[in-house]
């Protein structure tokens, strides 16, 4: 079965020194784990921390791109892809396709030339913001600076439509998502998140926005992040006082959800959006804790069986696991 992950943070770990050609103990993603998990294509996100602004943010994006290029070119069974045809070609040759996204449009500054250059270098979606409001729009964890899209953000949406760059509304405020739905002539993507009706995390989207993205032809990618999956776990983690890096202790908390919680969010998204508008966007390598039994990308091959046991048809499962996003791409 073809499997596509619409969001992982591999470049961030690459630039920190991880060799993705090796099977790294305790890592969530590397090329051997992608192969074991049956993952045929994965979007590697060029993540820009909110603390970086202007030229510093842009320089960081290009540094991530350079290191990602170096490592992909070293792996004999991985190759870049920029469209559905190249993904299919890689698949026929037994290669994992690495696609590129930019996470946090602050790296664009207010310069469409940077946008077009990144597109020419293979970047196919831009996550408009991250953990803070930026020059484009409000974040779901921001201060509501613009009340949605900024004036530049509205111009950017139109320019992204023009060049064929996908607009990713993960991390956006509800008001930003509504503005994008109103302005964009092309389908939106929500590359990594879950259903707010099942778990109240601010990064999750309410049913009406999930439905509106689907109605516009877009795809919503369900994440594996436990705090998106379970309010009980998010609450227990917060009260535990555990800090970043205490991964083993986070995994030992009794409320840690498993694959069944991810299946529940996928099933809810199918109910709200229709099965042809749901995908998988794990957020691996960008999260400090994973669901029980899904510690790495090597476990993604377990998901189709779990969805079948939940009652989904083979054709719906094939769409969710990757064909839906590939169709949009």
Q: What do these predicted regions represent?
A:
Residues 2-5, 40-45, 97-100, 125-128, ...:
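Structural recognition of the beta-strand scaffold that forms the well-ordered cores
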Residues 7, 34, 83, 122, ...:
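Conserved, mostly hydrophobic/aromatic
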Residues 10-27, 47-59, 109, 133-149, ...:
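Acidic/histidine-rich helix-loop elements
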Residues 19-36, 302-305:
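Short catalytic helix/loop segments, enriched in acidic residues and glycine
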Residues 28, 33-112, 128-133, 137-162, ...:
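A metal-dependent hydrolase metal-coordination microenvironment
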Residues 110-120, 124, 142-189, 202-218, ...:
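Histidine/acidic residue-rich metal-binding segments in metalloenzymes
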Residues 222-224, 273-296:
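Short acidic/histidine-rich active-site segments
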Residues 295-329:
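Mid-to-C-terminal alpha-helical segments outside catalytic/metal-binding sites
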């Amino acid at each position: 079965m073809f499997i596509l992950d619409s969001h992982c943070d591999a470049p961030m770990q690459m630039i920190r020194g991880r060799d993705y050609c090796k099977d790294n103990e305790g890592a969530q993603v590397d090329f051997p784990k992608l192969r074991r998990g049956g993952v045929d294509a994965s979007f590697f996100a060029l993540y820009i921390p909110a603390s970086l602004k202007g030229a510093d943010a842009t320089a960081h994006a290009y540094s991530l791109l350079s290191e990602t290029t170096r490592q992909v070119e070293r792996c004999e069974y991985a190759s870049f892809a920029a469209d559905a045809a190249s993904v299919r070609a890689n698949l026929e040759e037994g290669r994992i396709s690495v696609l590129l996204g930019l996470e946090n449009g602050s790296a664009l500054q207010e310069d469409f030339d940077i946008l077009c250059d990144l597109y020419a270098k293979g970047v196919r979606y831009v996550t408009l913001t991250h953990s803070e409001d930026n020059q484009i729009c409000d974040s779901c964890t921001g201060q509501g600076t613009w009340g949605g899209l900024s004036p530049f953000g509205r111009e950017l949406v139109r320019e992204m439509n023009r060049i064929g760059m996908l607009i990713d509304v993960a991390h956006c405020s509800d008001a930003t998502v509504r503005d994008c739905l109103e302005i964009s002539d092309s389908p939106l993507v929500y590359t990594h998140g879950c259903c707010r009706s099942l778990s109240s995390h601010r990064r999750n989207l309410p049913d009406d926005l999930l439905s509106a993205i689907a109605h516009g032809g877009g795809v919503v990618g369900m994440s594996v992040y436990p705090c998106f999956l379970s309010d009980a776990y998010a609450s227990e983690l917060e009260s535990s006082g555990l800090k970043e890096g205490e991964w083993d202790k986070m995994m030992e908390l009794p409320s840690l959800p498993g694959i069944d919680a991810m299946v529940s969010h996928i099933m809810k998204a199918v109910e709200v959006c229709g099965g042809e508008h749901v995908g998988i966007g794990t957020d691996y390598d960008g999260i400090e804790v994973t669901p029980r039994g899904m510690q790495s990308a090597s476990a993604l091959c377990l998901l189709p069986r779990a969805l079948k046991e939940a009652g989904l048809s083979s054709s719906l499962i094939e769409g969710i696991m990757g064909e839906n996003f590939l169709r949009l791409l």
